[in-house]
Amino acid sequence: MSKLSRKQQTQKRHRRLRRHITGTSNRPRLAVFRSNNHIYAQLIDDAAQSTLCSASTVDKELRSGLKNNAGSCDASVAVGALVAKRAIAKGIEQVVFDRGGNLYHGRIKALADAAREAGLQF
Protein backbone atom coordinates (compact mmCIF):
# COMPACT_ATOMS: atom_id res chain seq x y z
CA MET A 1 0.00 0.00 0.00
CA SER A 2 1.53 3.30 -1.09
CA LYS A 3 1.65 6.39 1.07
CA LEU A 4 -0.92 9.09 0.33
CA SER A 5 0.32 12.48 -0.83
CA ARG A 6 -0.40 15.53 1.30
CA LYS A 7 -3.13 16.67 -1.10
CA GLN A 8 -4.76 13.23 -1.00
CA GLN A 9 -4.67 13.27 2.80
CA THR A 10 -6.37 16.68 2.79
CA GLN A 11 -9.05 15.46 0.38
CA LYS A 12 -9.66 12.37 2.50
CA ARG A 13 -10.09 14.51 5.65
CA HIS A 14 -12.43 16.85 3.78
CA ARG A 15 -14.67 13.99 2.60
CA ARG A 16 -14.81 12.69 6.17
CA LEU A 17 -15.71 16.13 7.55
CA ARG A 18 -18.38 16.84 4.94
CA ARG A 19 -20.41 13.83 6.08
CA HIS A 20 -21.23 15.72 9.27
CA ILE A 21 -21.16 19.39 8.24
CA THR A 22 -24.03 20.93 6.26
CA GLY A 23 -25.13 24.50 5.84
CA THR A 24 -28.67 25.86 5.79
CA SER A 25 -30.06 29.25 4.86
CA ASN A 26 -30.23 30.17 8.58
CA ARG A 27 -26.75 28.84 9.36
CA PRO A 28 -24.66 28.50 6.18
CA ARG A 29 -21.36 26.68 5.88
CA LEU A 30 -18.22 28.86 5.86
CA ALA A 31 -16.08 26.82 3.46
CA VAL A 32 -12.37 27.62 3.25
CA PHE A 33 -10.05 26.59 0.41
CA ARG A 34 -6.33 27.17 0.73
CA SER A 35 -3.92 27.04 -2.18
CA ASN A 36 -0.22 27.79 -2.14
CA ASN A 37 -0.72 31.38 -3.26
CA HIS A 38 -4.28 32.33 -2.27
CA ILE A 39 -7.08 31.62 0.19
CA TYR A 40 -10.80 31.56 -0.58
CA ALA A 41 -13.84 31.63 1.74
CA GLN A 42 -17.50 31.28 0.84
CA LEU A 43 -20.78 30.99 2.67
CA ILE A 44 -22.75 28.09 1.21
CA ASP A 45 -26.38 27.08 1.67
CA ASP A 46 -26.19 23.33 1.01
CA ALA A 47 -29.97 22.89 0.99
CA ALA A 48 -30.39 25.31 -1.93
CA GLN A 49 -26.93 24.52 -3.36
CA SER A 50 -26.04 28.20 -3.61
CA THR A 51 -23.22 30.48 -2.54
CA LEU A 52 -24.53 33.35 -0.43
CA CYS A 53 -21.33 35.42 -0.38
CA SER A 54 -17.61 34.95 -0.81
CA ALA A 55 -14.23 36.61 -0.38
CA SER A 56 -10.71 35.74 -1.44
CA THR A 57 -7.27 37.19 -1.91
CA VAL A 58 -8.00 37.64 -5.63
CA ASP A 59 -10.84 40.12 -4.91
CA LYS A 60 -10.22 43.62 -6.19
CA GLU A 61 -10.81 45.07 -2.71
CA LEU A 62 -7.94 43.07 -1.21
CA ARG A 63 -5.57 42.59 -4.12
CA SER A 64 -4.16 46.12 -4.11
CA GLY A 65 -3.45 46.12 -0.37
CA LEU A 66 -1.73 42.73 -0.31
CA LYS A 67 0.83 43.26 -3.10
CA ASN A 68 2.78 39.97 -3.26
CA ASN A 69 1.69 38.64 0.14
CA ALA A 70 -1.54 36.84 -0.85
CA GLY A 71 -0.33 33.58 0.72
CA SER A 72 0.34 34.99 4.18
CA CYS A 73 -1.52 34.94 7.49
CA ASP A 74 -2.13 38.68 7.14
CA ALA A 75 -3.97 38.03 3.88
CA SER A 76 -6.06 35.36 5.60
CA VAL A 77 -7.02 37.83 8.31
CA ALA A 78 -8.16 40.31 5.65
CA VAL A 79 -10.23 37.64 3.86
CA GLY A 80 -11.85 36.54 7.15
CA ALA A 81 -12.82 40.10 8.02
CA LEU A 82 -14.17 40.75 4.51
CA VAL A 83 -16.30 37.60 4.34
CA ALA A 84 -17.72 38.39 7.80
CA LYS A 85 -18.53 41.95 6.73
CA ARG A 86 -20.33 40.71 3.61
CA ALA A 87 -22.22 38.05 5.59
CA ILE A 88 -23.42 40.51 8.22
CA ALA A 89 -24.55 42.87 5.44
CA LYS A 90 -26.79 40.01 4.20
CA GLY A 91 -28.12 39.37 7.71
CA ILE A 92 -26.09 36.22 8.45
CA GLU A 93 -24.50 36.02 11.89
CA GLN A 94 -24.20 32.29 12.62
CA VAL A 95 -22.24 29.88 10.43
CA VAL A 96 -20.80 26.37 10.49
CA PHE A 97 -17.03 26.38 9.91
CA ASP A 98 -15.69 24.00 7.25
CA ARG A 99 -11.89 23.98 7.28
CA GLY A 100 -11.82 22.04 4.03
CA GLY A 101 -9.72 19.15 5.28
CA ASN A 102 -6.86 21.46 6.22
CA LEU A 103 -5.39 21.40 9.71
CA TYR A 104 -6.74 24.13 11.99
CA HIS A 105 -3.62 26.26 12.36
CA GLY A 106 -1.76 28.95 10.48
CA ARG A 107 -3.73 30.58 7.68
CA ILE A 108 -6.95 28.65 8.36
CA LYS A 109 -6.94 29.63 12.05
CA ALA A 110 -6.10 33.26 11.19
CA LEU A 111 -9.10 33.45 8.84
CA ALA A 112 -11.43 31.88 11.43
CA ASP A 113 -10.26 34.19 14.23
CA ALA A 114 -10.68 37.28 12.03
CA ALA A 115 -14.20 36.22 11.02
CA ARG A 116 -15.11 35.72 14.70
CA GLU A 117 -13.71 39.13 15.65
CA ALA A 118 -15.69 40.75 12.83
CA GLY A 119 -18.95 39.35 14.24
CA LEU A 120 -19.59 35.85 12.88
CA GLN A 121 -20.48 33.19 15.45
CA PHE A 122 -19.26 29.60 15.16
Curated annotation (Swiss-Prot):
Regions of compositional bias (Basic residues) in chain numbering: 1-21
GO molecular function: 5S rRNA binding; structural constituent of ribosome
Region annotation (Disordered) ranges: 1-25
UniProt xrefs under CDD domains: Ribosomal_L18_L5e
InterPro entries: Ribosomal_uL18_bac-type, Ribosomal_uL18_bac/euk
One GO term of the biological process aspect: translation
Keywords (A to Z) from UniProt: Ribonucleoprotein, Ribosomal protein, RNA-binding, rRNA-binding
HAMAP family per the UniProt record, alphabetical: Ribosomal_uL18_B
General function of this protein: This is one of the proteins that bind and probably mediate the attachment of the 5S RNA into the large ribosomal subunit, where it forms part of the central protuberance.
Summary of subunit composition and partner proteins: Part of the 50S ribosomal subunit; part of the 5S rRNA/L5/L18/L25 subcomplex. Contacts the 5S and 23S rRNAs.
Protein name per Swiss-Prot or TrEMBL: Large ribosomal subunit protein uL18
Record organism: Synechococcus sp. (strain CC9902)
Taxonomic lineage from the root: Bacteria, Bacillati, Cyanobacteriota, Cyanophyceae, Synechococcales
